[in-house]
Each structure stands twice: as structure tokens, then as C-alpha cells.
UniProtKB/Swiss-Prot annotation:
Gene that this polypeptide is encoded by: dapA
Active-site residues, record numbering mapped to chain: 139, 167
Family designation: Belongs to the DapA family.
Matching Pfam families: DHDPS
Alphabetical list of PANTHER family matching this protein: 4-HYDROXY-2-OXOGLUTARATE ALDOLASE, MITOCHONDRIAL, DIHYDRODIPICOLINATE SYNTHASE
Alphabetized NCBIfam families for the sequence: dapA
Name of the featured protein: 4-hydroxy-tetrahydrodipicolinate synthase
Organism: Synechococcus elongatus (strain ATCC 33912 / PCC 7942 / FACHB-805) (Anacystis nidulans R2)
UniProt subcellular location: Cytoplasm
Broad class of enzyme this protein falls into: lyase
EC numbers: 4.3.3.7
Primary location group: cytoplasm
Keywords carried by this UniProt record: Amino-acid biosynthesis, Cytoplasm, Diaminopimelate biosynthesis, Lyase, Lysine biosynthesis, Schiff base
């Protein structure tokens, strides 16, 4: 189906598989990427928060971009997580990613150094102008970065031709309302929280950058398409059906729970890298219960 938005409706923020020695398992990453596309993902974010970008080297990230693009080709948008709190590093990483034929780049709000809004504007503008041929998705996640990208700043950035979307992960539906009022219809807003996908659709979002789509991609596609078709009751039904899983996937720091869930479903994706640790037995049991209820898992 042709996608009306720059990266589709359902974009999976993909986990990074590791082998028993803790090295990136590129072959499993390729298999997982193909599986996710077959299960309804229109796009894949590689080396984002869920992909454990803080503990990957640049060489590992670049090889992951290559491997995933090789695996999925043109069947899905491949979006490189090349953001940084150092503008020069973000530009260099994004320029390198642009040479690989990827479809876009995810640019997180600079973390820890907490620039003011004018600094955020200058940061993203510098990246956009240095990489004019690569579409950029802004990424607002103040719970991790310590700073929020304000709607007015996003509106200024939207005037740049290759700044085409935002992942809104503040947990604030009012932010999406403000964004939609300020931005052109061509600028895509993606929910950054699975549990807020339906509420954000109601105020003007187009889709979701999802963790849960590792497990329930077809259902998320059905939810969004039902809403688009005006079948709000069906969208609500799917939302409530999936809601326990949405919450279970954030019982502790992402991506710990989704990695455990994928292991329960038979994926050999290894342990997260320190300082992240494996899911507790209690969290694994909660995930198993949710997956069983959805008909996805049998103990």
C-alpha cells in the first residue's frame, strides 16, 4: 500500500541483537528486520533508544545501517539514529548514513547539555543544511534528554525542506495538539509512546514509532487504519486489547522488557549491554501473561 506519510504509519524502533559474547549479531538483525517488515512495519529506526545506541560504537552503528538496508531493500523505510548532543558528531554521523541509501535520520534533542530553544534550533538546522538530501525526523523525549523541544521551535524547523517529521515522546497529548496547529499538514507527527497512539491520532498524529510493533505490528496497523477509516470503535477496541502489553513493555527501562518478550517468542537476541540488565522474573512473567492473553505465547 502506498504510504501517505514520509515513513509510513507504523515504524518499529528496532532492538539490537547481540551474540553470546556481547557482539552485535548482524545476521540476526537482518532476520529480525525482515520479520518486522513482514509483520506490518512500514519503517525501522536503527540505533535509536530501543536499539541501545548509547552503548554501540559508531562502527557498529554504521554496519547495522548497512546490514538492515541490505536485508529490507525498498520494502520499508530505514531510518538511522544518528543524533548526538554534539552538533559536529551528529552532522558527521548523518552524512555517513546518507551515503548508504537510507530513507531518513532520527535526530534526538541534545541530551545532558540542555541547550536553550535557540540552541536546539541552530543544532537541528545545522544538521539539516549539512545533509540536504536526507529527510530528518526530530525526536523529542524530555524524560531522557532533560530538555524539551517546544512546538514553536519545531514550527521554525519545519520550514527547512528536509525536516519532515517529529517523534513526540513527551507523553503529552497537548503537545501534539499544539504541534498540529502550528505545522503544515505535510509535516508528520508520530507518537513516541505506544499507549498514546490512539489519543495522539485523535488530535492530529499520523502514526507511531513503536516498541510494541516487535510483537503486535499487524494489530497496530489495524488500529491506525481503523481510525483513518472513521471506525473509531474498532480502533478503541484494539487499543484496549493491546493496552496491558503497552504498559508491560515499560515496567522497567526500555528496551529491557521488549528484549525479554522477544526471547519468550524464540528470538536469540542476547543480553542487553551494561549498564542495562536483563528483565527480572516478575517482569518476564507479566510479559508472558500479556502475550498469552493475546494468543502469541504458550508456556
Amino acid at each position: 500500500m502506498p504510504q501517505p506519510y514520509p515513513f509510513g504509519r507504523v515504524i518499529t524502533a528496532m532492538i539490537t541483537p547481540f551474540n553470546a559474547e556481547g557482539q552485535v549479531a548482524y545476521d540476526i538483525a537482518q532476520s529480525l528486520a525482515v520479520h518486522l517488515v513482514e509483520q506490518g512495519s512500514d519503517g525501522l529506526v536503527i540505533c535509536g533508544t530501543t536499539g541501545e545506541s548509547p552503548t554501540l560504537t559508531w562502527e557498529e552503528e554504521l554496519q547495522l545501517f548497512r546490514a538492515v538496508k541490505e536485508a529490507v531493500g525498498d520494502r520499508a523505510a530505514v531510518i538511522a539514529g544518528t543524533g548526538s548532543n554534539c552538533t559536529r558528531e551528529a552532522i558527521a554521523a548523518t552524512q555517513s548514513a546518507a551515503t548508504l541509501g537510507l530513507n531518513g535520520s532520527l535526530q534526538v534533542v541534545p541530551y545532558y547539555n540542555k541547550p536553550p530553544q535557540e540552541g536546539l534550533y541552530a543544532h537541528f538546522r545545522a544538521i539539516a543544511e549539512a545533509c540536504p538530501d536526507l529527510p530528518l525526523m526530530l525526536y523529542n523525549i524530555p524524560g531522557r534528554t532533560g530538555q524539551s523541544l517546544q512546538p514553536e521551535t519545531v514550527a521554525r524547523l519545519a520550514s527547512l525542506p528536509n525536516v519532515v517529521a517529529i517523534k513526540a515522546a513527551s507523553g503529552n497529548v497537548e503537545e501534539v495538539s499544539a504541534l498540529r496547529q502550528l505545522l503544515p499538514d505535510s509535516f508528520a507527527i508520530y507518537s513516541g509512546d505506544d499507549s498514546l497512539t490512539l489519543p495522539m491520532l485523535a488530535v492530529g498524529a499520523q502514526g507511531v514509532v513503536s516498541v510494541a510493533s516487535h510483537l503486535v505490528g499487524p494489530q497496530l496497523q489495524a488500529l491506525i487504519q481503523a481510525f483513518e477509516a472513521g471506525n473509531v470503535a474498532r480502533a478503541q477496541q484494539l487499543h484496549h486489547q493491546l493496552y496491558p502489553l503497552f504498559k508491560a513493555l515499560f515496567l522497567t527501562t526500555n528496551p529491557i522488557p521488549v528484549r525479554a518478550a522477544m526471547e519468550l517468542l524464540g528470538w536469540s537476541i542476547g543480553l542487553p549491554r551494561l549498564p542495562l540488565v536483563p528483565a527480572s522474573a516478575e517482569i518476564r512473567q507479566a510479559l508472558a501473561s500479556c502475550l498469552t492473553e493475546l494468543g502469541l505465547y504458550t508456556a
